[in-house]
Curated annotation (Swiss-Prot):
Its cofactor is Zn(2+). It comes from Marchantia polymorpha. The gene is SOK. This is Protein SOSEKI. PROSITE patterns: ZF_C2HC_C3H (PS52027). Residues 253-286, 295-407, 696-709, 735-771 have a biased composition (Basic and acidic residues). Homodimer. Forms long polymer filaments with other SOKs proteins polymers crucial for polar localization and biological activity. Disulfide bonds: none annotated. It is found in: Cell membrane. Residues 219-470, 492-810 are annotated as: Disordered.
């Protein structure tokens, strides 16, 4: 309570003083109050008892005694609250105001808190104020609290009682030994449980108190009742067990306590609905299982199966004294000789009486270690497992289909191996052959495959003979390489050239024709080939059709549909193979070209007599080594004229590249008389590229293939058939290229010496003009007008060019360099112009910078810049047109007034 006194005017008897007071409740000051306190004129000042007397007359009794009072006074340029008693004088502030604050008594607040907590002491009640005494004398309403607590405890008790009773009844009914109780005993047990529950509930209702002791008592009684019921059930089960054991020992035919079908009781129906995850007794009786007669109906057998304990049959199904027919451990020597079908044969030979006993005892008795099974599967070939499966064919009637046989590659016995006995055929799958073919060292890969197959097929008795056969490994490698090429030709199908009659596999001149014929003369036919009318693993061409040309419009030879299914029939080689030539026919993608190119060169390095003879014959005859021919299919072709063009870039050339033809003749070179190795490119619909061992240079010539030429092994081409182009380099051609480069270098040096700032693009244009002029000089003939791709070419480094399908009359040299990228007109945006660092991109500043850089007089901005009529910004005329399309200024500026240079100079100075 703050008391503010203003203007203490002296009177004869009393004077009134204004006092401002604040009341503090709960640590917070309330709104201030103002009262007038009468003061006698004879007193020295205003005392606290005068203020309390005035508050009691205004606010009621106990108002002054319920608070502790303090006055506000100045202290060191600040103020403090000074506590006051009844006889203390209230000191005014510097401005003469009287301010009081009333705080709640600490003693009264503490006693009130203790009383609410239940720690109220009636002995100290005389020391409290009168109002607090009256509050303490009132009685606390315990009845309402007790009723609410009773309702909560009843609900909790009902829930706990029901849960406990249900769990107890479920435990009793789930006990397998309690099933033997009679109906009277089960009813007595249920009645006892219900009595215990009702007694516990009544005790809980009587002893329910405020401190929640009722729940503790009821839980204790419930636990005690549970323990008594459990003890009773345990004693009953012990008695029943003793009776059952005694009756079983006295007479084995007593069915009263056996596991036979008992009488239906009320607990049986209750048991079927019980959950399976309830705790059950783990004790299993050692009694024999019940003997169910065959004439019993299904319902009785189901009831018996439900009544039987689930743990008993696990130990009573099989007798443990079963005879052991096989040892647990098999020695490694004998396990290696066992075929893969040994476990199946053993299981089939076991007696069929008692299937459960045999099925249970078999994994215990026949224990084959995992290492033994792995070694048997690694050491034994697949033929041995097939033979063993044939031996057990009578017993395995359910197995009707045999597994698919993989293609076997059989070789003829060598002279060194004929003495040791019959040779076992090598089991090499096409996957292994293709992996060996695509490896960087196919010779080593084939050697490893042959060695592994020979060691698999050899037995301990023929180990000495296998060492003698190692001398003939190179010959076997050669034959396997040829057979691998045949398999790859079949698996990776391609389009053979119809004109190359000598390179067709079905022709008698082909080096692999003899190796592909079987011994009996019959051709095995693959059942999975669709539309394929041939036996060997290469496509046969259909006879009776002429090759189609673009001019005649006749039907050409159609490539056969490649086989899509796996190879199932083996290819057997019975005749001695002819001498190996230095290249074979493949069909593969671009990724396999490198491996296909490396394969013949590695095969020519073999130590076989056939390869050495063929290489020596080639050297003696003066011909160069044989080469691998690559062919790429051209998709672009014209209509009636028969002109076609292949892909010019290296990415387009890499589309479909496949080895197509064996070229063994020497092609003459125009630049040299010895016939140096070259790169031949045929511009037919299936162009062939023959790459020799060493490519020294690249030249381009065009020659026609005549049918009467002794050099050409091809068929006579039709009049409109494509011609063969041969790329080479001549000294005159190289000299022109060097001259053009020298001119370009001289131009660059002249520009540098003269100091003229010419761009690099101009120099490139000049160089391109020089090259095109030199190319037109050396071409000597017009290019074909039927070319679809336009002007495309390739350099000498990339080995790719434009192969134009030209008429047969062309007999001249054609070469064009790859043109540079077409030059475009330079367009530099006004914002992308080079500016000095630190400058802005405004148009007028750009103009000033351009004028300063070019040493020009300052421009007239009135003629260069124009102001926007909407937003007032200045732009160049072309920029203003663009700006006006998107200018959305809200306010319009004044009319356009072009300013001159002086105003701009003044504006720049001000800025």
């Amino acid at each position: 309570m703050v008391l503010v006194g203003q203007g203490m005017e002296p009177e004869e008897a009393f004077t009134k003083v204004q006092v401002v007071y604040y009341l503090s409740r709960g640590g917070q000051l309330q709104q201030p109050h103002l009262i007038d306190v009468p003061v006698s004129t004879h007193s020295n000042g205003l005392y606290l008892r005068d203020v309390k007397r005035r508050l009691t007359s205004i606010r009621g009794k106990g108002m002054g005694d319920s608070f502790s009072w303090s006055c506000k006074r100045n202290y060191k340029n600040n103020f403090i609250w000074q506590d006051l008693a009844d006889d203390d004088k209230i000191l005014p502030l510097s401005d003469g105001e009287l301010v009081l604050k009333g705080s709640e008594l600490y003693t009264g607040f503490q006693e009130k808190a203790e009383f609410m907590d239940g720690q109220f002491d009636p002995e100290n009640a005389s020391q409290l104020p009168n109002k607090i005494k009256k509050l303490a004398s009132k009685k606390f309403d315990f009845e309402a609290v007790k009723r609410s607590l009773d309702m909560e405890s009843d609900k909790l008790q009902e829930q706990s009682d029901l849960a406990a009773a249900l769990s107890l009844s479920l435990q009793l009914m789930s006990d397998p030994h309690m099933k033997r109780f009679s109906k009277d005993k089960s009813m007595d047990l249920n009645q006892q449980v219900m009595n215990s529950l009702s007694q516990a509930k009544s005790n809980a209702a009587e002893e329910c108190m405020l401190d929640h002791s009722v729940t503790d008592i009821s839980s204790e009684t419930l636990h005690s009742e549970e323990s008594t019921v459990q003890k009773f059930s345990f004693n009953e089960t012990i008695r029943e067990r003793s009776k059952s054991t005694a009756s079983a020992s006295s007479s084995g035919t007593d069915r009263e306590h056996s596991y036979g079908p008992p009488r239906k009781t009320e607990s049986m129906g209750r048991e079927r609905s019980l959950p399976r995850d309830l705790p059950r007794s783990r004790e299993v009786s050692r009694e024999l299982p019940p003997q169910v007669p065959r004439e019993a109906p299904r319902e009785k057998s189901r009831e018996m199966s439900r009544e039987l304990p689930r743990e008993a049959p696990r130990e009573l199904q099989l007798p443990r004294e079963a005879p052991r027919e096989l040892p647990r451990e098999v020695p490694r020597e004998t396990s290696r000789e066992l075929p893969r079908e040994a476990p199946r044969e053993i299981s089939r030979e076991l007696p069929r009486e008692g299937p459960r006993e045999v099925a249970r005892e078999q994994p215990r008795e026949v224990v084959v270690p995992r290492e033994v099974v792995r070694e048997v599967s690694r050491e034994l070939p697949r033929d041995v497992s097939r033979d063993s499966s044939k031996a057990v064919k009578d017993t395995a009637k359910t197995r009707q289909e045999k597994p698919e046989e993989l293609p076997t590659i059989k070789t003829k016995k060598s002279p060194t191996c004929s003495e040791s006995g019959d040779s076992t055929p090598f089991m090499l799958s096409p996957r292994r052959l293709m992996a060996a073919l695509s490896s960087p060292s196919p010779e080593k890969k084939f050697g490893k495959l042959v060695h592994s197959s020979s060691t698999r097929s050899s037995t301990p008795s023929t180990s000495a003979a296998s060492t003698q056969c190692e001398d003939s490994l190179p010959n076997i490698n050669i034959r396997l390489a040829k057979q691998a090429t045949c398999l790859s030709n079949f698996r990776l199908c391609g389009n053979a050239n119809p004109h190359a009659t000598d390179s067709r596999p079905d022709s008698p001149e082909h080096p692999l024709a003899a190796a592909a014929q079987p011994a009996s003369g019959a051709v095995p036919q693959s059942p999975n080939t669709r539309g394929h009318q041939g036996g060997p693993y290469w496509p046969r061409w259909r006879s009776g059709r002429k090759p189609r040309t673009s001019s005649e419009g006749k039907e050409g030879p159609e490539p056969p549909t490649p086989p899509r299914g796996p190879m199932t029939k083996p290819v057997t080689v019975a005749k001695p193979d002819p001498p190996l030539k230095k290249s074979f026919e493949f069909d593969m993608n671009v990724s396999g070209v490198n491996s296909a190119m490396a394969t013949p060169f590695l095969q020519t390095e073999n130590n076989s007599p056939s390869s050495s003879e063929s290489s020596s014959a080639a050297v003696s005859s003066g011909k160069k080594p044989a080469s691998i021919s690559l062919s790429g299919t051209s998709d672009a072709s014209d209509g009636g004229n028969g002109a076609s063009s292949t892909a010019s870039s290296s990415s387009e050339v890499q589309n479909n590249v496949s080895v197509k033809e064996v070229i063994t003749q020497q092609l003459p070179s125009p630049s040299s008389s010895e016939g140096r190795p070259s790169l031949n490119i045929d511009t037919a619909s299936l162009p062939r590229v023959s790459i020799s061992e060493a490519i020294s240079d690249v030249r381009e010539t065009v020659k026609t293939t005549r049918p009467d030429s002794p050099e050409s092994p091809m068929k006579p081409n039709p009049p409109s058939s494509p011609v063969r182009t041969q790329l080479s380099s001549s000294p005159s051609f190289n000299k022109r290229i060097e001259d053009a480069r020298a001119r370009a270098r001289s131009l660059v040096s002249k520009e540098i010496r003269s100091g003229e700032s010419r761009s690099s693009k101009d120099l490139l244009k000049e160089n391109d003009r020089v090259k095109t002029s030199s190319g037109s000089m050396r071409s000597g003939s017009t290019r074909t007008p039927n070319n679809k791709n336009g002007t495309t070419g390739a350099g000498s480094k990339t080995l790719s060019g434009t192969f134009n399908r030209s008429p047969p009359r062309i007999n001249s040299i054609m070469w064009e360099d790859a043109p540079l990228t077409p030059t475009k007109k330079e367009f530099v945006n006004r914002d992308d112009r080079p500016l000095t660092a630190g400058r802005t991109n405004l148009d007028w500043e750009k103009t000033l910078q351009e004028a300063a850089s070019l040493s020009l007089p300052p421009p007239d901005f009135g003629q260069i810049l124009q102001e926007c009529g909407q937003c007032g910004r200045t732009f160049k005329p072309d920029s203003l047109k663009v700006h006006m399309r998107g200018c959305h200024a809200l306010r319009r500026s004044k009319d356009f007034q072009p300013f001159n240079g002086t105003s701009v100079a003044i504006r720049t100075r001000l800025q």
